[in-house]
Amino acid sequence: INLVSIRSGYSIGGFDADKIVGGLELGVGKEGEIYHGIGRGELNIAGLPVYRDGVAGVGTPTSDEERTKIEMSTTSLLMILNGYSGKEGLLEAGGYSVDLLKRYVSAVNVEAELICRENRGKITL
């Protein structure tokens, strides 16, 4: 995930999909909202874009949350490539991600979905 982020310039969230409760919504961090960044402790996410599940925040552009972090026992990954500045290069970064996952962790049953303001649909990478 970090390699793809460095190479593409996109902020990328990586989560253990089995730890996410319900669906995800993108919102804005609130003053005083409790958020524990992986290896960083409690963070102030006020004003930052934040993905939330049915429990609390799970990801911001600067850090993912301890509760939904990827571990050695993770078997289902949710990876979000945030194209805040537009779609240019997003498909290439997604394809590179899938390539790495298949090559180095023997990923199977990989599904990708492009979600934009204008439309939403499954894509093949």
Regions from the language model: what does each represent?
Residues I1-L125:
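RNA/tRNA-interacting regions in translation and RNA-turnover enzymes
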